[in-house]
UniProtKB/Swiss-Prot annotation:
GO terms for cellular component: ribonucleoprotein complex; ribosome. GO terms for biological process: translation. It comes from Cyberlindnera jadinii (Torula yeast). The gene is RPL25. Keywords: Ribonucleoprotein, Ribosomal protein, RNA-binding, rRNA-binding. This is Large ribosomal subunit protein uL23. SUPFAM superfamilies: Ribosomal proteins S24e, L23 and L15e (SSF54189). NCBIfam families: PRK14548.1. This protein binds to a specific region on the 26S rRNA. Gene3D superfamilies: 3.30.70.330. GO terms for molecular function: rRNA binding; structural constituent of ribosome. Belongs to the universal ribosomal protein uL23 family. InterPro entries: Nucleotide-bd_a/b_plait_sf, Ribosomal_uL23-like, Ribosomal_uL23/eL15/eS24_sf, Ribosomal_uL23_CS, Ribosomal_uL23_N.
Length: 142
């Protein structure tokens, strides 16, 4: 009598094991890298502050004053560049946006430096379609 196939496969599963053997992955590094887990976006039930803080730096606070020294005038005439004293906390993006909004000009680049007296100076280079001399006249520091 031949044993039934179902019984034979059950016997084989008991002897061998139904899961089989898993090939182990060889670790080549000594550091264990934790896998990235799901990070859900925050959805707060209520605001933690009753009133949001007012804007710390608006356009009029970013630009303190134009600088009208001889070297600054040379930059205006030769380099199509305006020179401003700006707030110490203002970054290049804020300076660019402030000049764009206040004087209706397109800005090509902004270079900044901290002066020895602790103030920040910004060199604002304008695009070719805007003349720095005209803008300086409009501002009123020539």
């Amino acid at each position: 009598m031949a044993p039934s196939t179902k019984a034979a496969s059950a016997k084989k599963a008991v002897v061998k094991g139904s899961n089989g053997s898993k090939a182990l992955k060889v670790r080549t590094s000594t550091t264990f890298r934790l896998p990235k887990t799901l990070k859900l976006t925050r959805a707060p039930k209520y605001a933690r502050k009753a009133v949001p803080h007012y804007q710390r730096l608006d356009n009029y606070k970013v630009i303190v004053a134009p600088i009208a020294s001889e070297t600054a005038m040379k930059k205006v005439e030769d380099g199509n560049t305006l020179v401003f004293q700006v707030d110490i906390k203002a970054n290049k993006h804020q300076i660019k946006q402030a000049v764009k909004d206040l004087y209706e000009v397109d800005v090509l680049a902004v270079n900044t430096l901290i002066r020895p007296n602790g103030t920040k100076k910004a060199y604002v280079r304008l695009t070719a379609d805007h003349d720095a001399l005209d803008i300086a006249n409009k501002i009123g520091y020539i």
